[in-house]
């Protein structure tokens, strides 16, 4: 599938979600007009006024403007979605993510959309909150009362409230990973999914609007005079002295205004949540990809090709989701996976699909092993590696387990070979430390006691190899030619200069440690820099959804091959499948023995916001164990004939005995 075709798949789904949002908007606007003009004592007049305003010109204009805002909302949803959630490890990292340029643009755009939406709701509600400039009468002692134009602070209050709602929604969008697309575990019709989310949308909008209004009221009470004075000066308007200012206690008692603000905020959030839910429902809808085709030009649209290509992440996730559904519910399509190519008789479909699934599981295993090694080495002294090794370790990811083990063996073999210059530098540092100097901090004294006194400055060395290299390291070429292998007396001057530099460097490092210790005792610094206990574990399994699908699809296909694979194409790779599954299972079990890895966060089933990204590691653990049991219960004792290692045979026997 070409890039243009991939974008068209996404655009058609976004267009469908936007179309349904536009269809539902007249109902939302009619409901808002009815609720904003509520008159319990005069119900007939209330209904007649509401019906007459539904067909007015300003209502249609506001409806079109709100639909345009929803179109912008869909555009931002399409540009900012992701299938892998972002897991910040600390609050400072979260703040850094929010300050990225494209996310600042998202916040500013939602501020503008919030102001426009609040203006539309103010116009739809009519009454005294409809206009920003109103007519008023100025009272003066010398002159008679004269008409003038005054600032309607209630309307300004509502516009600024819309800006606050837009910015708060944008912050929540990234803080709670609302841009993360979580695929449903159970396939349902789109109507049933939307009906299930509709009560949650209403509940979330109602209570969150109250929460936002509380925060906004406090902010306006403290800083409301700044935008009010600026607008008043820019438009050359006066203040109506007959109306109390809203940044006073008397102005806060206007319950009618707060009801209007709450109702506008509720509908603003409800429409945005509605667009967001429809976008999620349509983009995560299952799509059927052909397994094979008779035409060469359509090969790019087939499932094996998409799984092994660098396509859009969403399209690849949809392909893996289709593979899971294929492996469970479609025997005819499974036969296409097990089929052989004609001519040639090669299992290209099974090879491509199994290769991608095994690569995904191998990459996750490598990542888990690296995370466990980093956790084990946390706080320990490491042997410094060369820059080449550092670049190699930082750039390598997703390699096979055999290559990783070979590389670790090479690194371990190079550890004892410590360079001579590092030994000489340490020795010269020890000889130049003066305990009575002002730089001799307790850390320096402790270091001086722990170093070996046999250094070149003391006139003796430990190793003859160091003595042979002394002239080469510490003297010039002319000194070597004059004195031969003897060490020139001039060699002591560079040693002392290097020792002074070493003292300054050690003193500077010690001061940095002291500064860090002082800052770590500050509450605000600890609040920003303290890491979340579960963040590192959640980050390792951030993309575990596609690995869960790979496990389920591969295990279902292997289990189905026991009775459906007539050519035996799956049995040729059964040993590698079992080996990788058992290796991954061992790595996962070791990971859950780490601190905070097994602590499961509390889930709120009544919340609209999805928190499934925080529990993906538990889902993968259950899916992995289920996948192995699915294979062992299907093949039974036949697995003893599969060539695997002795450790894996013991592990398989535990699964066969249902002791795992």
Curated annotation (Swiss-Prot):
Listed transmembrane segments: 14-34, 58-78, 104-124, 155-175, 206-226, 257-277
Start and end residues of each stretch annotated as Disordered: 375-408, 448-471
Transmembrane helix as UniProt keyword: yes
Subcellular location, principal: nucleus
UniProt superkingdom: Eukaryota
Matches recorded under InterPro entries: Nucleoporin_prot_Ndc1/Nup
Cytoplasmic compartment spans: 1-13, 79-103, 176-205, 278-660
Molecular function GO labels: protein-macromolecule adaptor activity
Alphabetically ordered keywords of this record: Membrane, mRNA transport, Nuclear pore complex, Nucleus, Protein transport, Translocation, Transmembrane, Transmembrane helix, Transport
Record flagged with keyword Transport: yes
GO cellular component: nuclear membrane; nuclear pore transmembrane ring
Any one Gene Ontology BP term: protein transport
Perinuclear space-side segments: 35-57, 125-154, 227-256
Low complexity composition-biased segments: 385-403
Intracellular or extracellular location(s): Nucleus, Nuclear pore complex; Nucleus membrane
Lipid bilayer topology: Multi-pass membrane protein
PANTHER family listed in its UniProt record: NUCLEOPORIN NDC1
Family of this protein: Belongs to the NDC1 family.
Name of the protein: Nucleoporin NDC1
């Amino acid at each position: 599938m070409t890039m243009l075709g991939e974008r068209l798949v996404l655009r058609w789904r976004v267009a469908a979600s936007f179309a349904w949002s536009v269809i539902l908007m007249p109902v939302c606007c009619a409901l808002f007009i009815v609720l904003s003009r509520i008159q319990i004592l005069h119900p007939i007049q209330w209904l007649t006024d509401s019906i007459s305003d539904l067909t007015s010109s300003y209502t249609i204009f506001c409806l079109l403007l709100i639909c345009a805002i929803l179109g912008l909302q869909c555009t931002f949803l399409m540009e900012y979605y992701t299938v892998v959630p972002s897991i910040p490890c600390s609050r400072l990292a979260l703040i850094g993510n929010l300050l990225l340029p494209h996310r600042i643009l998202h916040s500013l755009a939602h501020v503008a959309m919030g102001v426009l939406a609040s203006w539309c709701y103010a116009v739809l509600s009519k009454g005294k909150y409809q206009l920003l400039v109103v007519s008023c009468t100025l009272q003066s002692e010398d002159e008679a009362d004269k008409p003038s134009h005054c600032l309607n602070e209630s309307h300004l209050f509502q516009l600024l409230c819309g800006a606050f709602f837009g910015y708060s929604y944008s912050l929540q969008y990234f803080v709670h990973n609302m841009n993360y697309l979580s695929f449903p575990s159970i396939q349902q019709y789109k109507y049933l999914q939307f009906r299930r989310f509709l009560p949650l949308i209403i509940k979330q909008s109602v209570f969150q609007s109250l929460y936002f209004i509380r925060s906004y009221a406090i902010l306006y009470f403290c800083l409301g005079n700044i935008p009010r004075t600026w607008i008043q000066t820019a438009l050359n308007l006066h203040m109506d002295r007959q109306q109390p200012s809203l940044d006073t206690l008397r102005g806060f008692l206007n319950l009618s205004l707060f009801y209007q603000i709450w109702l506008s905020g509720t509908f603003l959030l409800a429409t945005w949540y509605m667009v967001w839910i429809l976008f999620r429902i349509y983009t995560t809808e299952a799509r059927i990809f052909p397994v094979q085709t008779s035409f060469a030009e359509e090969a790019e649209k087939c499932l094996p090709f998409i799984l092994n290509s660098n396509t859009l992440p969403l399209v690849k996730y949809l392909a893996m989701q289709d593979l899971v559904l294929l492996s469970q519910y479609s025997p005819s399509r499974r036969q296409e996976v097990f089929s052989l190519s004609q001519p040639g008789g090669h299992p290209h479909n099974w090879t491509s699909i199994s290769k991608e699934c095994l690569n995904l599981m191998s990459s996750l295993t490598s990542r888990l092993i690296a995370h466990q090694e980093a956790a084990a080495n946390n706080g320990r002294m490491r042997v410094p590696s060369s820059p080449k090794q550092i670049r190699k370790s930082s750039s390598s990811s997703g390699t096979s387990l055999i290559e990783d083990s070979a590389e670790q063996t090479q690194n371990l073999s190079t550890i004892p070979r410590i360079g001579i210059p590092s030994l000489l530098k340490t020795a010269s540092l020890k000889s130049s430390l003066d305990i009575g100097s002002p730089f001799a901090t307790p850390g320096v004294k402790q270091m001086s006691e722990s170093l070996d006194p046999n250094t070149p400055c003391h006139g003796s060395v430990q190793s003859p190899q160091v003595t042979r290299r002394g002239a080469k390291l510490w003297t010039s070429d002319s000194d070597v030619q004059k004195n031969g292998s003897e060490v020139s007396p001039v060699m002591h001057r560079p040693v002392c200069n290097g020792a002074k530099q070493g003292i300054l460097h050690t003193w500077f490092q010690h001061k940095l440690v002291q500064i860090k210790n002082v800052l770590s005792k500050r509450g605000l610094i600890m609040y920003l820099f303290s890491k979340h206990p579960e963040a590192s574990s959640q980050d390792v399994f951030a993309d575990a959804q596609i690995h869960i699908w790979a496990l389920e699809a591969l295990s279902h296909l292997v289990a189905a091959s026991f009775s459906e694979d007539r050519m035996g194409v799956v049995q040729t790779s059964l040993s590698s499948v079992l080996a990788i599954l058992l290796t991954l299972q061992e790595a996962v079990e070791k990971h859950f023995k780490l601190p905070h890895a097994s602590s499961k966060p509390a889930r709120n089933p009544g919340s609209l916001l999805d928190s499934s990204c925080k529990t993906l590691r538990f889902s993968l653990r259950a899916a992995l164990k289920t996948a192995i049991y699915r294979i062992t219960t299907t093949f039974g004792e036949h697995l003893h004939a599969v060539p695997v290692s002795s450790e894996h045979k013991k592990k398989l026997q535990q699964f066969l005995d249902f002791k795992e």
